[in-house]
Amino acid sequence: MELTHLDDKNRPKMVDVSSKSETKRVAVASGEIKMSKEAYQAIISNNTKKGPVLQTAVIAAILGTKKTHELIPMCHPLLLTGIDCDIEEIPQNNTFKLYVTARLNGQTGVEMEALTGVSIGLLTIYDMVKAIDKSMIISNVQLESKSGGKSGDFKR
């Protein structure tokens, strides 16, 4: 498979998508953060010094999704049509699982946007409770599904 972000002289480039037709595109990404019982309970009970952790993580995930093109060099600025976030509580493992769904009608996919949103949301949780638990583990950041575009659909 040819790398599309390199020109014929092996220099980096942003792919030209102007000849591609617009299609509806949706990507869902997820990731987890595992922590101590003390940190988990502080979040659940809204008893942290920095405020409402999960609500702030959702806002951060939305912002991260919107700002992906400013963080990942070869990502196109996109006109997103929607971003949804959901946080699953997994108390038996002191874990939160964050899902981000990004949507648009456009010429390129939104996988990187969904993945970036998840990453920023999880990092925000870490930042807000690191005073309680510095050993938190962020893991399993992954694409769950995508639809639309030339490469077709994907579902994990």
Curated annotation (Swiss-Prot):
Q: Which UniProt keywords apply?
A: Lyase, Molybdenum cofactor biosynthesis
Cite the Pfam families for this sequence: MoaC
Name the source's superkingdom. Bacteria
Name the pathway: Cofactor biosynthesis; molybdopterin biosynthesis
Record: residues binding substrate? 74-76, 112-113
One GO BP annotation of this record? Mo-molybdopterin cofactor biosynthetic process
State whether keyword Chloroplast applies. Answer: no
Q: What does this protein do?
A: Catalyzes the conversion of (8S)-3',8-cyclo-7,8-dihydroguanosine 5'-triphosphate to cyclic pyranopterin monophosphate (cPMP).
What is said about its interaction partners and assembly?
Homohexamer; trimer of dimers.
Q: Which NCBIfam families does the annotation name?
A: moaC, PRK09364.1
What's the family?
Belongs to the MoaC family.
Protein name (record): Cyclic pyranopterin monophosphate synthase
